């Protein structure tokens, strides 16, 4: 049997592996792609941009573009002239994104300087969407946006490596139920949507529950006991196993509607039930009263918190259903072959 020819891919990532977006969309896939015969190189965008680092990155990207069969821009939105120059070296470009890059993060949405930067970024985004042979979106909301500019658009949800996310085996009893949240500090503003429900719940449930925040910055909520733990790169699963219920509040904004709900996927992967706002991809990931609860109002948040705090069997049952859904739809083991097929098709185009 003739051996399938190896495909060479260079990933131009927005961040290095310390940031979740690039880690989840690229770095976690690398061993799986390599086992399928791909040769992969990753070139993260420099965190501190100077004239020297900019030129070095440009020359490195052009060299790797000449080496590769496929160039993947992961969330990297840069000047048109650079995209056009790279496209002359290698026109087989894929653009992958997992955020509503046309609008600022909620924490900076009222900053006029940030908004001005995003007005420029939108033009760059539209350009690369039109120039890419293929676009990969993290959810259907993003895919619909990309379809305005690109003819070939695929959806691959942000996914977890099942081998790295073992099921939680030890559960708290009703004496101290831990509701947990893990994420970037700029997303702590999302607790605005759940704050009143949390306050009402803790007013009734008191010291028998707590909220644990895992991030690089703490959170303070009136009337809510919060325990803060500083996030560390290689301790994600340890943090998740310390929760009994995963929380994913979201403000109903354009940016939130474009997010891929990876927090909920992480919770479900280790067998945690989820309480989430019904915004964007959360409605596709969390099945109400099957893998968790969708809560919009303070009353709905309070009820969901109370039900899960009071019923260990319910927590375990919803958590098991969540893990099964992740195994079906949100695992790298399941989605790596889909990514491989797309890359091979672009390489041969």
Label each PLM-derived region with a short phrase.
Residues 20, 189, 227, 233-269, ...:
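Nucleotide-sugar-dependent
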Residues 288-299, 307-313:
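Conserved acidic donor-binding segment of nucleotide-sugar-dependent glycosyltransferases
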Residues 17-32, 159-165, 172-242:
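Conserved catalytic-core segment of nucleotide-activated headgroup transferases in glycan assembly
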Residues 16-19, 43-49, 94-126, 161-163, ...:
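Acceptor-binding helix/loop patch of EC 2.4 sugar-transfer enzymes
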Residues 57-67, 81-89, 99-103, 114-135, ...:
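Membrane-proximal helix-turn-helix segments that form the acceptor-binding/catalytic region
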Residues 130-167:
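Donor nucleotide-sugar binding/catalytic pocket of nucleotide-sugar-dependent glycosyltransferases
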Residues 307, 314-329, 335-341:
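A short, well-ordered alpha-helix in the C-terminal region of glycosyltransferases
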Residues 2-7, 163-178, 328, 345:
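Nucleotide-sugar donor-binding and catalytic loop/hinge architecture
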């Amino acid at each position: 049997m003739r051996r399938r020819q190896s495909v060479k891919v260079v990933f131009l990532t927005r961040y290095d592996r310390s940031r979740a977006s690039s880690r989840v969309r690229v770095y976690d896939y690398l061993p799986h792609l390599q086992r399928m015969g791909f040769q992969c190189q990753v070139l993260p965008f420099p965190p501190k941009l100077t004239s020297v680092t900019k030129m070095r990155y440009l020359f490195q990207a052009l060299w790797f573009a000449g080496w590769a069969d496929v160039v993947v821009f992961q969330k990297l939105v840069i000047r048109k002239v650079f995209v056009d120059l790279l496209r002359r070296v290698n026109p087989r470009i894929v653009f992958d994104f997992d955020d509503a890059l046309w609008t600022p993060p909620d924490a900076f949405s009222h900053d006029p300087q940030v908004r001005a930067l995003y007005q420029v970024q939108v033009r760059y985004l539209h350009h690369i969407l039109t120039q890419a042979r293929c676009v990969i979106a993290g959810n259907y909301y993003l895919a619909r946006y990309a379809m305005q500019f690109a003819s070939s658009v695929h959806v691959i949800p942000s996914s977890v490596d099942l081998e790295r996310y073992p099921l939680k085996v030890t559960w708290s009893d009703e004496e101290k139920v831990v509701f947990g949240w893990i994420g970037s500090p700029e997303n702590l503003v999302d607790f605005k949507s759940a704050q009143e429900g949390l306050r009402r719940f803790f007013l009734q449930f008191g010291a028998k529950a707590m909220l644990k925040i895992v991030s690089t910055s703490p959170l303070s909520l009136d009337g809510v006991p919060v325990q803060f733990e500083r996030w560390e790169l290689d301790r994600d699963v340890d943090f998740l196993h310390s929760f009994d219920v995963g929380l994913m509040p979201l403000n109903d904004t354009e940016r939130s509607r474009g997010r891929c709900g990876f927090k909920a996927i992480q919770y479900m992967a280790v067998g945690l039930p989820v309480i989430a706002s019904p915004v964007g991809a959360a409605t596709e990931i969390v099945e109400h009263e099957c893998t968790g609860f969708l809560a919009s109002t303070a009353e709905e948040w309070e009820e969901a918190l109370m039900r899960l705090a009071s019923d260990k069997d319910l927590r375990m049952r919803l958590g098991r259903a969540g893990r099964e859904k992740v195994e079906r739809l949100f695992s790298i083991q399941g989605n790596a072959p889909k990514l491989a097929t797309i890359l091979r098709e672009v390489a041969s185009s």
